[in-house]
Amino acid sequence: MRFICRDLGFDTGFNYKETDNYEAKLKELCPNGIDIYFDNVGGPITDAVMRLINTRARIAVCGQISQYNSDQPDVGPRWFGQLIIRQAKVEGFLVHQFADHYDEARRQLSTWLREKRLKYREDVVEGLENAPQAFIGMLSGDNIGKRLVKVTERTYSARPGSVGEEVTVG
């Protein structure tokens, strides 16, 4: 929690592995309810959130990782009634829908990175031979930040036309 509160500026948060009563924890942390929810998890956490949404809440659904490897995926949303009562808006979110903005986004994000306005953490695992365990660990949540596998050191050749060199053809 220190990382998300101190480094990223969130007011609060919780580790889903440290409680089995998500609704109680969310009520404690969000006593006035939830206005905005970015859902890439699905399952019991989303069920708990939906019981606490405020009137005209907005929900972006990007993924359902809790369901990806399930032998018996959840049967439909049990919270449609809440959406109606709370007049909430749910919209699917795919990054590809913004493909025509990629160049502009890359420029802006690069600027923000240089200015240190965007914060991130990388969790680097050394060696391709460790990739399978790194992937499994990522799916089980044993990392903080972006999980990367470092395959090799990057080296450059002194030959003209090699990676990293600019060649002018006259």
Question: For each of these PLM feature ranges, what is it?
Answer:
Residues M1-G170:
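Terminal helix/beta-alpha structural elements that buttress the NAD(P)+-binding lobe
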